[in-house]
Regions:
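P-loop NTP-binding catalytic core
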Residues: 77-145
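N-terminal accessory targeting/assembly segments
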Residues: 1-93
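Conserved P-loop NTPase nucleotide-binding/switch module
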Residues: 223-282, 287
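Conserved lysine of the Walker
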Residues: 157
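Hydrophobic positions on the alpha1 helix immediately C-terminal to the Walker A/P-loop
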Residues: 160, 164
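Conserved P-loop NTPase
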Residues: 104-115, 280-300
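Hydrophobic anchor at the beta1->P-loop junction of P-loop NTPases
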Residues: 149
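P-loop NTPase switch/communication element
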Residues: 168-219
Length: 300
């Protein structure tokens, strides 16, 4: 599927008027569109090559935001209530709709969203081959080393993680291994109807929708993985789960926000992972001059 085709697939979830606005974009712009933003009271905008621009139509109505959710849920909000509580919906093709509105709270937790005020349709695109520049450096002797992918937000950590999972699972440039993925927010595999919407390989098992630490332990106990993967280490329990898994002989593959090894050592959350030698390789992603650059470093 081409980038423009992915755009056309994604916008089918929009109400009719907004869908027509989106499809008025030229094919070249469709291929470069990353997101469509719908804000009540303002015209819909498109994020194209990093720049947000209005599409020129009338302001988005609150009813259109409700229609968006009705279409995305196939007229069954109850079936997707757990996703809505987390602020997003995953639709066929791996595309994602982020939602904002008034939170309905119960016992200190978000139970639902009402009076929707904005939505963000993020267009999913598979980037097969993204891991090619780093694969040799991460697979000494043909087998994946414990690897941490590190970069500031928005530089492609998840894209690189997904393609590494796919390559390892398929035995592309390395030994084929069983991979288990804890995909808390569904951003890596984008499961829909029990199937990954984005390619993560034939030997990959996925659990999504639960906290990362719990997902890691579930996979470790139940699926016998050779590689355990997770996107975005963000909490102490994630660190504890990865440290425990490292002691079980499974290879680890993870991402984190940061700028380099010294940055991680200064932060209490990540310091134990480096001091205890949980990871053997570090991949840094930078974008000087607008082009991504990957650097592989040995950590031990």
């Amino acid at each position: 599927m081409t980038a423009a085709d992915s755009f056309v697939q994604a916008v089918q979830v929009l109400p009719l008027r907004l869908r027509g606005e989106a499809l008025s974009l030229l094919e070249g712009d469709r291929a470069r569109t990353e997101e469509l933003r719908l804000r009540a009271g303002w015209p819909m905008t498109a994020l194209i090559a990093g720049a947000e621009r209005p599409l020129g139509g009338p302001p988005v109505e609150g009813e259109e935001l409700d229609q968006l959710v009705e279409i995305a849920s196939r007229a069954s909000r109850h079936a997707v209530l757990d996703q809505i509580r987390r602020g997003y919906l995953t639709i066929e093709g791996g595309h994602r709709i982020g939602l904002c509105g008034t939170a309905v709270m119960r016992e200190g937790e978000i139970h639902a969203l009402r009076a929707l005020s904005s939505a963000d349709l993020r267009i999913a695109r598979q980037v097969e081959g993204a891991c090619a520049p780093v694969l040799d450096g991460l697979c000494p002797g043909g087998r994946l080393a414990d690897t941490l992918i590190l970069a500031p937000p928005g530089l492609g950590k998840t894209t690189l993680l997904r393609d590494l999972i796919r390559a390892v699972s398929e035995g592309e440039g390395c030994l084929p291994l069983r991979v288990a993925l804890a995909d808390e927010r569904g951003e890596v595999a984008a499961m829909y109807g029990g199937r990954p919407q984005l390619a993560v390989g034939r030997r990959t098992d996925v659990v999504e929708g639960c906290p990362k630490a719990q997902g890691l332990m579930l996979l470790l106990r139940g699926m016998g993985p050779q590689v355990l993967a997770v996107d975005e280490i963000t909490a102490p329990e994630d660190v504890r789960a990865l440290t425990a898994a490292a002691g079980c002989g499974v290879t680890l593959l993870a991402t984190a926000h940061g700028n380099g090894r010294e940055d991680l050592l200064r932060r209490p959350l990540y310091r134990p992972l480096l001091e205890e030698g949980v990871f053997r390789r570090l991949v840094r992603i930078e974008r000087p001059g607008g082009k991504r650059v990957y650097t592989v470093e040995e950590l031990s």
